[in-house]
């Protein structure tokens, strides 16, 4: 269900889809959020729109764009570029209320080539990674069948795991 909705998001939608849960967070007393965002056909500048909403709401957040090969190599590359640009901006701005991680959707939606490129770019920037890991048996099964290793082994192979990874 979510993947179909993600594909329809515009940059304006990204702002408002962030603002609603930010308002809810304020009502519930939450002060810091970690978001793993996806809008495959509006990836570029999507994190800036979400950051704009976070700043307006007055909360703290760690944001990333979830890289995936679900919609092809171009959208995966756009996701990598969005993470790189946003991480660099956060590092330059040094805003204590806004941080960035390098987002990866999940091992079963990322090719080896994309995983390698994302790992290389993230490590070059000293970034941590945010990745869904073995959330279902199907993720383990897919990795064992297609890569002859389990999810965590594959993430380790590409040096995704570390003290800054969630």
Predicted features along the sequence, with ranges:
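Metal-coordinating catalytic core of metallo-dependent amide/deamination hydrolases
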Residues: 37, 44-166
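Metal-associated gating/positioning segment near the N- to mid-region
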Residues: 1-48
């Amino acid at each position: 269900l979510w993947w179909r909705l993600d594909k329809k998001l515009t940059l304006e939608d990204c702002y408002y889809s962030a603002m609603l849960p930010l308002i809810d967070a304020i009502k519930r007393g939450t002060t810091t959020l970690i978001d793993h965002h996806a809008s495959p056909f509006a990836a570029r500048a999507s994190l800036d729109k979400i950051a704009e909403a976070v700043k307006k709401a007055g909360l703290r957040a760690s944001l990333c764009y979830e890289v995936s090969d679900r919609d092809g190599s171009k959208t995966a590359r756009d996701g990598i570029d969005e993470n790189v640009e946003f991480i660099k901006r956060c590092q330059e701005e040094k805003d204590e209320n806004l941080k960035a991680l390098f987002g990866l959707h999940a091992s079963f939606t990322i090719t080896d080539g994309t995983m390698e490129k994302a790992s290389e770019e993230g490590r070059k920037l000293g970034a941590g990674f945010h990745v869904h890991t073995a959330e279902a048996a199907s993720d383990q099964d897919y990795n064992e069948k297609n890569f002859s290793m389990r999810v965590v082994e594959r993430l380790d192979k590409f040096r995704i795991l570390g003290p800054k990874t969630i």
